[in-house]
Amino acid sequence: MTVRKTERFAFTGSQGDLAGIIELPATQPHRGVAVFAHCFACGRQSIAATRVARDLAERGFAVLRFDFAGLGESEGEFGQTGLLGNADDIVSAVEALAQRGLQCSILIGHSYGGAAAIAAATRLPQVEHLVTIGAPFEVDHVLDTIGADRAELAGAGR
C-alpha cells in the first residue's frame, strides 16, 4: 500500500517552463514542504531525487523535485544557467508551491544541487531547514565541476 501520491508539477523558471514532480503524503496536514535540487546534469528522475522525495512523502512531507533548465523535460539551455540560474529556479519553485498553498520550509540539495540550494536559501527567509547531500564546499571544486573560469565568472557575474 502506497502512503503517498505523485503528481506532475510545472512552473515558470528563469528560462521558461520547468518540469517537476511533487510527491505528496496521503494524509493531511503535511509535516512540511521541501524542494529537492538534483545533482549536476542528473535531473528529477535520478535515483537520489526519486528515493529521497518518495521516502519523505511516506513520512508525511510534500516534496517537489524538478529538472533544472535545459534538462529532462524543462525548457531552456542547460549550459546557460550557471549556479545562480539554478538558485533562481529553486526560488521560483518555492514561489510556485506557495501559489498552490504549500509553504516550503525545507531545501534539499544533492551534490551541485546542494550548492544551488545554499545560494537560494539566502533569498528565502521562510526556509528553516537546509539539507545538503555530498555538496561541494570548496570554490575550486565547484569551478572544476562546472568547467568555469574564475575571470569569466567575475566578469559575467555568474
Language-model features and meaning:
Residues R44, L71-L102:
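Catalytic nucleophile-loop/oxyanion-hole region of alpha/beta-hydrolase
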Residues Q99-S111:
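Alpha/beta-hydrolase fold nucleophile elbow
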